[in-house]
């Protein structure tokens, strides 16, 4: 996430296609090398290379998509792009575990790397980098430095609230994903194989459907009122909260799975609309860097604090609640959706005015 910022800084100045190809190549090669690591240091260095390659693909991809589609049509393609996360998780849960069980973790790394190398070749011949600002009908200016982009975001009321709200949503999501396997094993005495199959269906398929539909409905409703891009996230987050609480407190595994289906499906819905509004509010010449800043904050706080918070709360609750400590900790984390909704609602309240200030039509 950290190295995504300098890579995005470069992507706003050179060919985004080349940045994506180089990053994907690095990701795939270093993933393959992970399978040959002989000690912890070698595996750590290879894994760092994987992270650098991963960090360099998303921001320029988001910026290119924003330049290909009109402002009121961006949420859908950005959501479709995000489906890679759900598909990857589905494959990891179903295929990765099987390969690891039968052939070992080294082979699993090598198998995972091969599709990326194939995509590098495909991208070299088919990927096109559109002119910056094409979909906005304006020519991009000279790319600004990092400080100017950071100040632009900080001084924009909508972007401030959007980043805070989306970060809280991500914190809830990362915490849940990290602890759901332990929750099902510890609370419902399920096997790891059973948990893998359930999460593959819930997150891989259910989450993927929710992500795609979120982008679609955000674009459809947003054509009536652009604020629906954010209202949609707020409404579904609030509707999904009781389902999450009920699932974590359920004493029956089947009931917990059924209740989780809805919040997991809409949990990643924020992705398309959030990125669509980000790229509508920033200038074309700063899109890659703005996207990298958003992802950096989302990941550092969401991934850094989300799972940790549940673990700390579970330890704290264990004295008084014993085996129910983890469910109560996950319920507490889920309540952050209320806080997130406040910031996203505030972002919606200033969205139209801030879009008009950019010279576009809200």
Regions from the PLM with identified roles:
Residues 2-41:
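Conserved MFS/SLC helix-loop-helix module at the cytosolic interface between two early adjacent transmembrane helices
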Residues 15, 36-42, 53, 70, ...:
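Helix-breaking motifs and short loop linkers at transmembrane-helix boundaries and internal kinks
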Residues 25-38, 237-251:
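C-terminal ends and interior cores of transmembrane alpha-helices
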Residues 46-86:
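Cytoplasmic helix-loop-helix junction between adjacent transmembrane helices
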Residues 81-129:
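Helix-loop-helix hairpin linking two adjacent transmembrane segments in secondary transporters
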Residues 107-125, 327-346:
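Symmetry-related core transmembrane helices of the 12-TM Major Facilitator Superfamily/SLC fold
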Residues 131-163, 187:
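Juxtamembrane intracellular "pre-TM" segments in multi-pass secondary transporters
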Residues 157-212, 267-271, 275, 303-310:
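Extracytoplasmic gate region of multi-pass secondary transporters
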């Amino acid at each position: 996430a950290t190295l995504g910022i300098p890579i995005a800084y470069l992507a706003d100045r050179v060919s985004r296609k080349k940045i994506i190809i180089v990053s994907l190549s690095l990701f795939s090669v270093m993933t393959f090398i992970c399978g040959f690591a002989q000690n912890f240091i070698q595996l750590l260095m290879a894994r760092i290379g994987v992270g650098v390659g991963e960090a360099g693909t998303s921001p320029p991809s988001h910026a290119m998509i924003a330049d290909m589609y009109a402002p009121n049509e961006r949420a859908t393609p950005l959501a479709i792009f995000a489906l890679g996360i759900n598909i990857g998780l589905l494959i990891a849960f179903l295929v990765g575990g099987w390969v690891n069980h039968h052939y070992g973790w080294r082979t699993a790394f090598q198998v995972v790397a091969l599709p990326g190398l194939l995509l590098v070749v495909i991208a070299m011949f088919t990927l096109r980098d559109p002119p910056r600002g094409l979909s906005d009908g304006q020519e991009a200016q000279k790319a600004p430095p990092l400080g100017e982009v950071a100040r632009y975001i900080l001084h924009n009321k909508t972007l401030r609230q959007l980043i805070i709200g989306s970060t809280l949503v991500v914190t809830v999501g990362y915490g849940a994903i990290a602890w759901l396997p332990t929750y099902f094993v510890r609370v419902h005495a399920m096997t790891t194989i059973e948990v893998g199959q359930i999460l593959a269906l819930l997150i891989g398929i259910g989450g993927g459907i929710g992500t795609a539909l979120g982008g679609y409905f955000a674009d459809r409703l947003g054509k009536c009122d652009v604020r629906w891009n954010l209202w949609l996230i707020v409404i579904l987050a609030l509707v999904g909260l009781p389902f999450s609480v009920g699932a974590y407190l359920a004493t029956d595994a089947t009931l917990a799975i059924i209740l989780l289906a809805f919040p997991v499906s809409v949990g990643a819905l924020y992705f398309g609309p959030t990125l669509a509004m980000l790229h509508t509010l920033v200038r074309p010449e700063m899109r890659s860097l703005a996207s990298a800043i958003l992802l950096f904050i989302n990941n550092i706080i969401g991934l850094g604090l989300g799972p940790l918070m549940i673990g700390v709360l579970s330890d704290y609750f264990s004295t008084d609640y014993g085996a129910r400590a983890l469910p109560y900790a996950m319920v507490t984390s889920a309540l952050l959706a209320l806080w997130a909704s406040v910031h996203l609602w505030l972002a919606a309240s200033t969205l139209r005015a801030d879009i008009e200030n950019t010279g576009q039509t809200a």
